[in-house]
């Protein structure tokens, strides 16, 4: 069964409604799948440029520190062995690729589950635009988002062409901005509420179902 959302304008007035397809916003939430996808996404974000030097990489240490016998001490062959200060590191990190291969269908299913969880709990909102006109206003955008939800972490999904909206909220703490084609499981789960502009919501629905939703008055 399709869910229906009221579409609100910056002044708080309801400008109509839009239906959320059940296949995208009322899908079962597979927690294990979402965990796997989020883990892979965060792993792929790691640079993996960490590097340590082994005893073979550290400069110096070619000379035997003292003779083999007669000192009463344990025999040593190099001052760059790991037990010495300034020596090499044993089993230290080396540059590597942390990315994991995740099938596209799993990524899409995890995102559907995350959005469905938010939708079932009334945490998805639809708006016409963040600010009226083409002039950015952080004050107006903050007041509008505050009227939509009292929760701190908000994901705002708007079209790439909405520069006024992006500039209005980009400095607000707890607010993260994405384009509809950037929508991902991690950011949806990290946010308490997800706010879609009608343009972005229609673009996401069209890209994943092939049938854009119309806003009804």
Curated annotation (Swiss-Prot):
Q: Which GO terms describe its molecular function?
A: rRNA binding; structural constituent of ribosome
Q: Which Pfam families match?
A: Ribosomal_L4
The UniProt entry, under InterPro entries, shows: Ribosomal_uL4, Ribosomal_uL4-like, Ribosomal_uL4_dom_sf
Keyword rRNA-binding set for record? yes
- Give me the ranges of the annotated region Disordered: 42-100
Print the keywords alphabetically: Ribonucleoprotein, Ribosomal protein, RNA-binding, rRNA-binding
What family is this?
Belongs to the universal ribosomal protein uL4 family.
Quaternary structure, from the entry: Part of the 50S ribosomal subunit.
Would you tell me the protein name for this molecule?
A: Large ribosomal subunit protein uL4
């Amino acid at each position: 069964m399709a869910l229906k959302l009221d579409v609100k304008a910056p002044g708080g007035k309801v400008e109509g409604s839009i239906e959320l397809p059940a296949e995208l916003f009322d899908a079962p939430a597979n927690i294990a799948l979402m965990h796997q996808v989020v883990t892979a996404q965060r792993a792929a974000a790691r640079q993996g440029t960490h590097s340590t030097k082994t005893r073979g990489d550290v400069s110096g240490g070619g000379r035997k520190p003292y003779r083999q016998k007669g000192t009463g001490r344990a025999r040593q062959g190099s001052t760059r062995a790991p037990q010495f200060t300034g020596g090499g590191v044993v089993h230290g990190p080396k540059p590597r690729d942390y990315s994991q291969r995740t099938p596209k269908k799993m990524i899409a299913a995890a995102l559907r589950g995350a959005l469905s969880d938010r939708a079932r709990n009334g945490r998805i909102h639809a708006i016409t635009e963040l600010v009226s006109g083409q002039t950015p206003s952080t004050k107006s955008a903050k007041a509008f988002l505050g009227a939509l939800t009292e929760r701190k972490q908000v994901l705002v999904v708007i079209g790439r062409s909405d520069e006024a909206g992006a500039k209005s909220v980009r400095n607000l703490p707890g607010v993260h901005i994405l384009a509809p084609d950037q929508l991902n499981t991690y950011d949806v789960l990290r946010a308490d509420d997800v706010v879609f502009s009608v343009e972005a919501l229609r673009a996401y629905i069209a890209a994943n179902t092939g049938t854009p939703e119309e806003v009804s008055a």
